Amino acid sequence: MKLFKYITIAFSSLFMCGCSDYLDNAPDDTLTMEMVFNDRTRTEDWLSGVYNRIPDNYWDLLKVWGYDSMGDDLDPSQRWYQWWGNSLNFIIGQWFTSSTWDAAIWSANPIRIRSAYLFIENAHALPDQGVSEANIERMKDECRFLIAYYYWQMIEAYGSVPFFDGLADVNDPNLMRGQMPFDEMVDWIDAQLVDLSKKLPASYLNESTQFYGRATSIMCLAVRARMLLFAASPLVNGNEWYAGFKNYDGKFRFSQTYDPAKWKRAADANRELIEA
């Protein structure tokens, strides 16, 4: 009987030790920034998450709620009404101030941008895990590209947008700010892409396949060329429809006069892309 008690106590002790070890493990949803960026796999996962949030232009701009569909014939017929009803209503003029819309890029891209800024601020070299300072700098440059790209998507869709050149502080009294003028946004994105086109590799052909699809200097030049062409177009280059559109500080959100020099700037950017 005593032997049975001793065996029971011994097994109970082992079981409790095992439970203690299991319960002491912190779940993933309580990870801190320090825990994430002190680990190579989690650091790389964070960067992948910034990439993974790249939206699909078709579904975020044109889809069921997309106002682009009002001027686009690339839309299903009446037989598709049960799936594309809202877009069809927009096309035939059945839309009102109360019509629904999808915030899509407006609400999601600032989250994507903040995620990239968090990486830039917190990521650091992990030499004991095979992550050099050069590796980290390239990954941060990739985040800078994604920030520029996400902002480009926003101004393409909405024109003038709120802008943060870094992490937004929730205690900042200027957190709720007006929209930065369209041309100023273009200039900022342009400067970022020009700088990054000199830092990022042109391709990853000699790298592991895990780098396929990552930001390159060619991507920088391509986004820049497309953006500057858009910025030169009559839609945002002296469009009289935007006359008088101002922020609370009195700044015009869009250029009030047509500037033909923007076409030259766009042409030069596209030539640079072609010759790259």
Place the predicted regions along the sequence by residue.
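Short coil/turn linking the two alpha-helices of tandem helical-hairpin repeats
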Residues: Q153-A157, P162, Y204, F230-N239
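Acidic/histidine-rich, surface-exposed loop or edge segments in extracytoplasmic proteins
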Residues: A26-T32, F90-T100, D249-G250
